[in-house]
Amino acid sequence: MGYLYETHMHTSQGSACAHVPGAEMARLYKEAGYTGIVITDHFWGGNTAIDRSLEWADWVNGFCEGYEDAKREGDRIGLQVFFGWESGYNATEFLIYGLDKQWLLDHPEIRDCTVEQQHELVRRSGGIVVHAHPFREAPYILEIRLFPAFVDGVEGINVGNRDPQWN
């Protein structure tokens, strides 16, 4: 028996670019034969759907809604659902895995971290940093920037975008 996981997905609750809410994403991926998914909505410095003028706790609660809905539905239908996020630095993006909502609530300083500081804080806390779609060419990406000393992995395949040129 094989395992199939989607490790980079956005929900309409957390990411401005997404069109489908978390619970529906869970159902769609279960129907497609997936074992599990990781919700990685766009974080503070990226294409987030959450109002940055909110107090930090309110922002985090709103940010986590897509994941929480997907997790509830995943538990109900037998799909593993994990939490992560995609941080953005001038169109250079990183997937963060292994941390949770409480960690975000306890670390508001993550909003202002540099790439280097993010890696240090995430790693010290037990998480990992993966460079998302490092070679994507798109109008919003002015330059391709690589940070080999500040990532634990690199996303090799990124597909499923509405515009195929970004796959």
What are the residue ranges of the model-derived segments?
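A metal-dependent hydrolase metal-coordination microenvironment
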Residues: 1-116, 149, 156-167
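Short beta-strand/loop segments at the ligand-binding rim of alpha/beta enzyme cores
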Residues: 2-4, 121-131
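Extracellular glycoside hydrolase catalytic/binding regions
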Residues: 134
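Alpha-helical scaffolding within the catalytic cores
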Residues: 137-141
